[in-house]
Amino acid sequence: MFVAMNRFRIAVGHEEAFENIWKGRESSLAEMPGFRTFHLLRGDTNAEEGYTLFASHTVWASKDDFTAWTQSENFRQAHKNAGDNRGIYLGPPKFEGFTAVVGA
């Protein structure tokens, strides 16, 4: 199992707009071999630094399945508007990938 996460720092006051971007986007993840699940997670707000933390969280059967997604036309289509709404982001997302070593 492989877990892929992108962490986003979203400017305070723009959380709902960010969530709506994700709610309104077309996704073809379910069509991809090895895809298991997706969640958009909302974390705490850091008032001092002016952001709320979010993470996109996908689970894949394997890292190879995730890599195939990132190289697919479906991925390109899903991310074609990624540069829009720049004012709500405090920097680019930070990717983190994990391979399961223990699980139930």
Predicted regions and their residues:
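Residue-level preference for beta-strand/loop junctions
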Residues: 2, 50-52
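Active-site-flanking beta-strand signature of metal-NTP-handling nucleotidyl enzymes
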Residues: 3-8
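Short hydrophobic/aromatic beta-strand micro-patches
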Residues: 9, 41, 57-59
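Short, surface-exposed ligand-recognition loops at beta-strand->loop->(often short) alpha-helix junctions
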Residues: 10-19
